[in-house]
Amino acid sequence: MSSPLLPVGVFDSGVGGLTVARAIIDQLPDEDIVYVGDTGNGPYGPLSIPEIRAHALAICDDLVGRGVKILVIACNTASAACLRDARERYDVPVVEVILPAVRRAVAATRNGRIGVIGTRATIASHAYQDAFAAARDTEITAVACPRFVDFVECGVTSGRQVLGLAEGYLEPLQRSGVDTLVLGCTHYPLLAGLIQLAMGENVTLVSSAEETAKEVLRVLTERDLLRRHDAPPVNRVFEATGDPEAFIQLAARFLGPAVSGVQPARLHSRVR
């Protein structure tokens, strides 16, 4: 049986999932966190589904093997590729980023027209479109915005070049008259101001990061796994499969100095 003292395991293809980690820290400040960013293999967007699945499950195997009380797949592309496998594979609860955002978008829309933006792999998987299928009276427009991740990973989140790119990507959503837009990649909240500017103030942006943190809180509460206020001091560990120094520089934009002690990830698991 899981212990409330075990950490929350968070995994992403790179630094984007730190938006989820930030939201978890804000909403559950007493929780220990182990975060692994697969910067050595990410971004996942251009990869094939089998490649994404292999990389993602190797890291998830390692996190679960080390001992976590809940596993958060903080990557839309990985959620679309391996969520079912992960839930069948592990005894701990697995939280992903797609369904929480879908629920929030359905609640937020006024005209039933909802947009989704994400990586090519996420949009091509139809994971969001399928998740919205159960919602009545909704019309979904999904658009891939592959270069957004490249700009965020390079630390560029504003400026005329990115705004021009955003206006081009988002034009089909404006034509569709969406009033709610799901940021279907955990990198995209860092571009939220720019996306809002391109879409207009009347469009509601839904962050999968914030909604995922709410789902983590709900699951831990439901299973009586919340860490007590009087538990030992909080310990947050951040690891990267690629260059830790490069990760630190990018991660500072998400979490500030809290990630100064990034460690190289040493994975021992293999996908079966």
Curated annotation (Swiss-Prot):
GO aspect biological process, one term: regulation of cell shape
UniProt keyword terms in alphabetical order: Cell shape, Cell wall biogenesis/degradation, Isomerase, Peptidoglycan synthesis
Positions contributing to substrate binding: D12, S13, Y44, G45, N76, T77, T186, H187
Catalytic activity entry: L-glutamate = D-glutamate
UniProt xrefs under InterPro entries: Asp/Glu/hydantoin_racemase, Asp/Glu_race, Asp/Glu_racemase_AS_1, Asp/Glu_racemase_AS_2, Glu_race
Pathway: Cell wall biogenesis; peptidoglycan biosynthesis
Pfam families documented for this protein: Asp_Glu_race
GO molecular function (one): glutamate racemase activity
Lineage top rank: taxon: Bacteria
Main EC class the enzyme belongs to: isomerase
Entry annotation: catalytic residues: C75, C185
Enzyme Commission number(s) of this protein: 5.1.1.3
Function: Provides the (R)-glutamate required for cell wall biosynthesis.
The family this protein is said to belong to: Belongs to the aspartate/glutamate racemases family.
Name by which UniProt lists this protein: Glutamate racemase
Annotated organism of origin: Mycobacterium leprae (strain TN)
